[in-house]
């Protein structure tokens, strides 16, 4: 768990009667940046963003929630809708509770990046989004075969270490990252929340769901988007950022030479890239 600093504090509040943990910091009147964590086993706001948030909070108002089912938030999920939909609604309900009504900049890694893109694809939320930055989060498509390697988890630290090796480049903070991620993975309810949507349904009860139109709803959306693709990432198909850039007229694609989570292993370099994009986007919007 992230140790509280003078810049970043940890809070838990009720949102729609569901415990919701989030990290926050920076000036109260700063431009709001919402950081969205990855969806791997043991994912949480501090696991994904602990080294980036203090850098961002020097200038921006930062808010980093734990998604439902993850971290210190309620282990409450919906299995009748997509894994994105109910978490997007919960995220904006949290912002409402915090009095954040102006458009926010969404910054996500992996599943968190996909949440940002899926929110942008939804006309109900598009007006509340000033920009989206996604680091190796595609919104769902373009998965590579290695994605299957991080799905199974037997509850052991050794298995989580194998998953972490796929997600992250080697770094001095690897043991601390493993400790934090394993701590959240062991919280009661997390395993069930992760496994629940994948439970087999008897043939007699199976209902064919409508085809997913994504990414077509993003076609022509002019909101600024930063697509960060990593050349060492084996979980996604190479070139996914160019494919999305072809759909989004105001998207910028950048490459980094790392694995799936450079925000964890190379926080300063990652933040410099994101911060530069945010500065240009904010200045361009004035």
For the regions a protein language model found, what residue spans apply to each?
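Active-site loop/oxyanion-hole signature of alpha/beta-hydrolase fold enzymes
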Residues: 64-107, 125
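Flexible "cap/lid" loop of the alpha/beta hydrolase fold
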Residues: 117-122, 126-162
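Conserved HGGG/HGGXW glycine-rich cap/lid loop of the alpha/beta-hydrolase fold
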Residues: 18, 23-74
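Conserved alpha/beta-hydrolase catalytic His-Asp/Glu region
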Residues: 143, 154-219
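Gly/Ala-rich beta-loop-alpha elbow adjacent to hydrolase catalytic centers
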Residues: 108, 112, 116
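Catalytic active-site module of serine/aspartate enzymes centered on a nucleophile-bearing elbow/loop
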Residues: 250-286
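Acidic catalytic loop of the alpha/beta-hydrolase fold
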Residues: 232-236
């Amino acid at each position: 768990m992230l140790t509280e600093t003078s810049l970043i504090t940890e809070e838990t509040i009720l949102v729609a009667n569901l415990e919701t943990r989030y990290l926050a910091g920076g000036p109260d009147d700063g431009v709001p940046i919402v950081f969205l964590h990855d969806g791997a086993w043991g994912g949480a706001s501090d696991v994904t963003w602990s080294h980036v948030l203090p850098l961002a909070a020097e200038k921006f108002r930062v808010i980093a929630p734990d998604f439902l089912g993850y971290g210190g938030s309620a282990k409450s999920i919906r299995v009748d809708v997509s894994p994105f939909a109910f978490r997007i609604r919960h995220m904006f309900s949290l912002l409402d509770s915090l009095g954040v009504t102006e458009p926010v900049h969404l910054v996500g890694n992996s599943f968190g990046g996909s949440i940002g893109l899926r929110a942008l694809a939804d006309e109900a939320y598009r007006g509340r989004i000033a920009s989206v930055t996604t680091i190796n989060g595609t919104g769902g498509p373009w998965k590579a075969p290695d994605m299957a390697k991080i799905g199974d988890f037997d509850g052991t630290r050794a298995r989580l270490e194998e998953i972490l090796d796929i997600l992250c480049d080697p770094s001095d903070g690897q043991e601390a990252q493993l400790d934090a991620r394993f701590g959240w993975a062991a919280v009661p309810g997390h395993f069930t929340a992760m496994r629940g949507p994948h439970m087999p349904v008897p043939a007699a009860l199976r209902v064919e769901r409508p085809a997913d139109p994504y990414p077509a709803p993003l076609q022509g959306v002019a909101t600024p988007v930063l697509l960060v693709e990593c050349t060492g990432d084996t979980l996604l198909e190479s070139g996914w950022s160019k494919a999305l850039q072809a759909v989004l007229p105001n998207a910028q694609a950048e490459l980094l030479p790392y694995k799936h989570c450079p925000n964890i292993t190379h926080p300063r370099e990652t933040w410099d890239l994101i911060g530069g994009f945010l500065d240009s986007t904010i200045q361009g919007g004035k």
